[in-house]
Amino acid sequence: GRSCDMVSRDYLIGGRRARLWVVDGFGSDSILERMGAFWLTLKPENVVGLTEMQDFLDRYITFSESNVTFDISDAVTSVFLGKSLLAVEGLAGVALMDAKGYPSRSVHEPPDGKVLRGSHDGFVEAVVPNMALLRRRIRDPHLTMEGHKVGSRTHNDAVLCYLDDRVDQDLLRKLRGKLLGLDVRSLSMAQESLAEAIRPKQWYNPFPKVRYTE
């Protein structure tokens, strides 16, 4: 509900209400657009008598890797693994479709975050691919991403990420309150300006209060 990287799209398929869920940045936009356009052409007579999602999948879903599930836990986990979920009014079960479009870094690894083993990708300048990179590695339904706008002129995107079942709720409320209460015109130095704006001003503490990663 609160994660800004979880997006949904409502359809009317043959007179029946339907909804598609996908994690922003995980789905292939071109594939999902083509499938959505096809579903919108279906008429009521095309879905008359259908009561099972498996029958709908066999007729009108062309993804090679797709399946039906009745388990809500399996459905949620599959969405966070990159699959798209379709639910249609009057059909038992939901369809899971593999239309992944994982983001990948096309430039060099971060100069300040080199690793000897493991992946060499890093954060980029766009917030949606960065959220998808985090979601790709932390496939926990408790991972929540709250989107905020900061800066009365620049309207910079700021995302508050946390595990809902592990986070210190008092600290989370304080951080959220500071983000919502910021009164700045712009973040000229991006994350450095944001950290400077939300952290307490204590001149007598020489140690860093914020860690950065690329």
What are these regions (language model features)?
Residues 1-214:
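Cytosolic regulatory modules rich in charged/polar residues
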